[in-house]
Amino acid sequence: MSKQEKSNVEDKSLDIETAVQVETAQESASGALEELSVEEQLERAKDTIKELEDSCDQFKDEALRAKAEMENIRKRAERDVSNARKFGIEKFAKELLPVIDSIGQALKHEVKHEEAIAMKEGIELTAKMLVDILKKNGVEELDPKGEKFDPNLHEAMAMIPNPEFEDNTIFDVFQKGYMLNGRIVRAAKVVIVKN
């Protein structure tokens, strides 16, 4: 007998052994079921149903948790997008503030020559346009003269005594502050009254 024929015979004998084992297992399982009483079979069926119901409840719970997590992720993403829209120009606005300050300082100087007066009026219009554009995009100017000092909005540069005003009243403003949609971009630099 060749090696190939021996191998085929061995494979067939293994297949026969496996088939016999499977058939024996099936017979013993069906025999065991037949040996169980109807009450025992009913009890086993109830146990199986209970296990399946528990599994189903667990899957439902996991599905609800996954749904809640997805909802939280969606809300967080919406909030992040909203904040990106609201505060996306913050850096740009911060960089423009010194320009606005410089224009404001230039406009404080008095001019007498007609050409200089006309130029000053043009600069005033340009400054107004710039401030209007910033306002349109959520940037608000803080000019707190006469208000109570708030360390969240103001930076105290100096304190002076003045009996005409209450303590912590803002007497003068060195540099205006700015907010972007309720968030401080730059605190106002102020002089406060301290008696």
Swiss-Prot record:
One of its GO terms (cellular component) is cytosol. Its main location: cytoplasm. Keywords: Chaperone, Cytoplasm, Stress response. It is found in: Cytoplasm. It holds the Pfam family GrpE. One of its GO terms (biological process) is protein folding. GO terms for molecular function: adenyl-nucleotide exchange factor activity; protein homodimerization activity; protein-folding chaperone binding; unfolded protein binding. Transmembrane segments: none annotated. Disulfide bonds: none annotated. The keyword Nuclease does not apply. Coiled coil: none annotated. InterPro entries: GrpE, GrpE_coiled_coil, GrpE_head. It comes from the Bacteria. Belongs to the GrpE family. Participates actively in the response to hyperosmotic and heat shock by preventing the aggregation of stress-denatured proteins, in association with DnaK and GrpE. It is the nucleotide exchange factor for DnaK and may function as a thermosensor. Unfolded proteins bind initially to DnaJ; upon interaction with the DnaJ-bound protein, DnaK hydrolyzes its bound ATP, resulting in the formation of a stable complex. GrpE releases ADP from DnaK; ATP binding to DnaK triggers the release of the substrate protein, thus completing the reaction cycle. Homodimer. This is Protein GrpE. The gene is grpE.
